A protein has these predicted regions:
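Low-complexity, serine/threonine/proline-enriched polar segments
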Residues: 127-150
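...with weaker cross-activation on analogous glycine-rich loops/strands in unrelated enzymes
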Residues: 144-170
Length: 170
């Protein structure tokens, strides 16, 4: 109901932690500083009622499926889909914390696309359904290089490859 939503949503909140209140009778757990949970809770949000935008800046057709929009810059290509958004948040968290060795995604064919290898100057060579590393660039630890890596991940990984890496929690 609208009344229940209004008690859970604080329209003035600027992060998920300050925008989305725990339901009545519940408390938010304490999470360690620099943990992924803390990162998600403190990630900046766009103002309340902001529309979800597509890569080209147009509005997504269903604007009733979200209660908040992360202040995450859009990329120009139509690559970031459902699972890609989850992969991006994880990768952004590890990149921001300098934990580059933890950025690793399996492509749909099972190939392990390690960001540490990418930033060392290796690039992924695809030949049919096979992938391999080829040293073809200079080492680069810039954010632009990270975004190029993520474009490859978005192109060749997705829900299927994430499912093989996911662990159940219950």
């Amino acid at each position: 109901t609208e009344a229940a939503e209004s008690s859970v949503i604080n329209p003035n909140g600027e992060t998920t932690q300050t925008r989305i209140n725990p339901p009545q009778g519940y408390e938010r757990t304490q999470e360690p500083e620099r943990s992924f949970a803390e990162y998600l809770r403190t990630y900046p949000l766009k103002p309340d009622k902001s529309p979800v935008l597509l890569y080209d800046g147009s509005e997504k057709s269903n604007q009733n499926a979200h209660i908040a929009v992360l202040k995450l810059p859009l990329e120009n290509e139509n690559l970031q889909q459902c699972a890609d958004s989850v992969m991006r948040i994880y990768a952004e968290y590890f990149f921001e914390n300098g934990e580059y060795d933890k950025i690793n995604f399996r492509l749909t064919n099972g190939f392990s696309a390690k960001y540490s290898k990418w930033r060392s100057g290796y690039r992924i060579k695809l030949d049919g359904n096979n992938a391999s590393w080829v040293k073809s660039a200079q080492p680069d630890d810039s954010y632009d290089c990270f975004k190029k890596y993520m474009r490859i991940v978005f192109s060749y990984a997705g829900t299927m490859s994430m499912e093989s890496e996911a662990r159940g929690i219950g």
